[in-house]
Amino acid sequence: PDLEGSLMVELVLINMARLEQAYPPLILRFDDLSGQQVAARRLSAAEYLPRSLSADRPMPVDKAVSIKLAILDPGERALSYSVSVEQ
């Protein structure tokens, strides 16, 4: 990313259900070498969707949605990350 001290997280969401549904909240988590959480953040659809998509519209079926997030670097202790869909 253009900002010093930031990271770019890129992911693709695909709605594998048989019907359109709301874009889910995402949980972005960073862990240290021992698997302990260093940082985490819950992101609403309005926060992560690109400007070309609206959180007010449903997520289409079987369509890839590319997401790019510029976030602050959680520090050198954060050695791995995961993204999960909030249930």
Label each region the model flagged.
Residues P1-L3:
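Low-complexity, acidic Ser/Thr/Pro/Gly-rich terminal tails and inter-domain linkers that flank the onset
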Residues L11, I27-L28:
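Generic short beta-strand
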Residues L13-R18:
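Asparagine-centered strand-capping/turn motif at beta-strand->loop junctions
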Residues E20-Y23, V38, A78:
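Short acidic/proline- and small/hydrophobic-mixed sequence motifs that coincide with surface turns
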Residues L28-D32, V85:
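Conserved aromatic beta-strand anchor motif in extracellular beta-sandwich/beta-rich domains
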Residues L33-G75:
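Intrinsically disordered, low-complexity Pro/Gly/Ser/Thr-rich segments with frequent PxxP/GP/PP motifs
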Residues A70-Q87:
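Short, surface-exposed ligand- or partner-binding patches at beta-edge/loop junctions that are enriched
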